[in-house]
Amino acid sequence: MSDKHINLVIVTGMSGAGKTVAIQSFEDLGYFTIDNMPPALVPKFLELIEQTNENRRVALVVDMRSRLFFKEINSTLDSIESNPSIDFRILFLDATDGELVSRYKETRRSHPLAADGRVLDGIRLERELLSPLKSMSQHVVDTTKLTPRQLRKTISDQFSEGSNQASFRIEVMSFGFKYGLPLDADLVFDVRFLPNPYYQVELREKTGLDEDVFNYVMSHPESEVFYKHLLNLIVPILPAYQKEGKSVLTVAIGCTGGQHRSVAFAHCLAESLATDWSVNESHRDQNRRKETVNRS
C-alpha cells in the first residue's frame, strides 16, 4: 500500500455489541478515530485527510445512532469504493439478541430504535436494517461470549500492522520517592540502595543523563547485578502484558530525588528495551530540585 493511500476501517454493527471498546482499541493501535460519524460527512472528511500529511490510518464508527442520516450509507460506501487512494474495510460487531438485551438491562440505557422503550423490538428492527451492511462486511465479530479484553485482542490481531510496536508501548520513567509515587505506574522499582551521586560534589548538580553521573551509577557492582536481574524479570513478561490486551505498560524506577540513580537506570532500561519494543523514556523529577532552588 502506498504512503498516499488512506487505510480506512468503518466500524459498525449492533448497538451494544462493543463498538465503544472497538474504537478505543483502534485508537490504541494508532488510528485516527471518530465515533458516531454521519455517513454523509465521511467523503468530505476523507478529502481533508488526503490533503494533509497526518495519520492516514482512520477508523470511523458509523451506526444507527445517525438515524435518518444512516440511509445514506450505501451512497457513501460507493463513493469510498470509487476512490483509488482509499483502502477500506468494514468491521461489523454482532451479538445474540439475548446478550444484547442483557447488556442493555445492565447499563440501563435505551436502544436508539426502541421508540416505545421495548429493547428487543429495537434490536430486531436494527438487525433487519443492518443485514445488507453485514453481508458486505469483510470482518464480522460475534462478541456474545467475548470480554472487552478479548475483543481488544481480536481487533489487535486483525488490524495491527505487524510487530510488537504496532499495538503495545512501554513507558519507562524515573521519579523521586520524596515527590510521591507515579499514579499510573504498573511496575515500580526502587534503586535507593545504590550509592548516591548527590554526595559527590562534582556530580550533585548534574543528572543521570550526564555521562559522568551515568557511569558512576552503572559502574557499581550492585548496579550491574540489579540491572541484570531487572532485565531478566521484565523482558520475559512483556509478551504476556501484550497478549493480555494492555496497550501501554508503565515501568517506573525511583530513587530519593529522581535526579541521579533512577534517571540513569531508566535511561539504560529504555535503551535496552527499544531494540525490540516501542519505548518512550521520561524523567519526571530530574529537574525538580533545581526548580525548587530557583524559586527560593
Curated annotation (Swiss-Prot):
What Pfam families has UniProt attached to this entry? Answer: PapZ_C, RapZ-like_N
Residues reported to bind GTP: D63, M64, R65, S66
Record bears the keyword Nucleotide-binding: yes
Q: Which GO terms describe its molecular function?
A: ATP binding; GTP binding
Arranged from A to Z, the UniProt key words for this protein are:
ATP-binding, GTP-binding, Nucleotide-binding
Q: Where does ATP bind?
A: G13, M14, S15, G16, A17, G18, K19, T20
Disulfide bond annotation, renumbered to this chain: none
Instruction: Extract the PANTHER family matched here.
Output: RNASE ADAPTER PROTEIN RAPZ
Q: What does the function comment of this entry state? A: Displays ATPase and GTPase activities.
Q: Which family does it belong to?
A: Belongs to the RapZ-like family.
Protein name in UniProt: Nucleotide-binding protein SPy_0652/M5005_Spy0539
Q: Which organism is it from?
A: Streptococcus pyogenes serotype M1
Q: What high-level taxonomic lineage is stated for the organism?
A: Bacteria, Bacillati, Bacillota, Bacilli, Lactobacillales
